UniProtKB/Swiss-Prot annotation:
InterPro entries named among the record's database cross-references: Diverse_Catalytic_Enzymes, HD/PDEase_dom, HD_domain
Phylogenetic placement of the source organism: Bacteria, Bacillati, Bacillota, Bacilli, Lactobacillales
Gene3D superfamilies attached to this UniProt entry: Hypothetical protein af1432
Residue ranges of every copy of the HD domain listed in the record: 24-141
PANTHER family: BIS(5'-NUCLEOSYL)-TETRAPHOSPHATASE, SYMMETRICAL, SLR1885 PROTEIN
Full protein name: Uncharacterized protein in pepC 5'region
Species annotation: Lactococcus lactis subsp. cremoris
Segments traversing the membrane: none
Disulfide bonds: none
Length: 195
């Protein structure tokens, strides 16, 4: 995979934005409103532009390889959980929020929240959080051969919460490497909402 180096000079940020648009638009953003997560399911408080921006920015923290993520998070003053230190891949969601806010000047707290929890979801999630979380799973890096995709799409035909709970149960039963506390809290919230 292409590694991006960002020095955050004005020119580098422009290049980064162009690469993000080229890399993510087709792969991820259109999926927010396809494959079952349809516009009709998004209430009037969430705009397509919020979902678009969150979808565009959600993985920018991935510019830092796993072996640099703890160091970068500490440098940026990002609080890390034990589970994130143990499995640095997860840190990219917090780095993405930081970069979106500090370097791309995103100020909408709803967008920043969705970026920050797109991998794990979290307790008291918003509808935008849930949509970006699901779009991220539908557009899984492994392509269409995601082992959970068919079941997730079936659950999505019921509602967003059912799809999210299906995915979380699937990865836990499949031997999740690290159980992030936010994921477990989101699971409880989903179970309560669906009971």
């Amino acid at each position: 995979a292409e590694q991006l180096v960002i020095d955050y000079s004005e020119k580098s940020v422009i290049v980064q934005k162009e690469k993000l648009i080229a890399k993510n638009t087709d792969e991820n953003l259109k999926l927010i409103f396809t494959d079952g997560v349809q516009q009709k399911e998004i209430n009037q408080f969430i705009s397509k532009s919020q979902a678009f921006v969150a979808g565009l920015m959600h993985d920018i923290g991935g510019v830092y390889p796993n072996h640099q993520r703890v160091e970068k998070a500490e440098l940026f003053g990002i609080e890390l959980l034990t589970e994130e230190r143990e499995f640095p891949l997860i840190i990219h969601q917090k780095l993405s929020k930081y970069l979106a806010r500090e370097h791309f000047k995103i100020t909408d707290e709803n967008i920043l929240s969705a970026i920050e929890c797109h991998t794990t979801l979290k307790e008291n999630f918003t509808e935008l959080d849930l949509i970006v979380f699901l779009a991220d799973k539908i557009s899984w890096d492994g392509g269409d051969n995601a082992p959970f995709k068919e079941g997730l799409l079936t659950a999505l035909s019921v509602n967003l919460q059912s799809a999210a709970l299906y995915y979380i149960d699937f990865i836990i039963n499949d031997g999740l490497k690290v159980a992030h506390p936010w994921l477990l809290e989101a699971k409880k919230d989903l179970e309560n909402q669906l009971s």
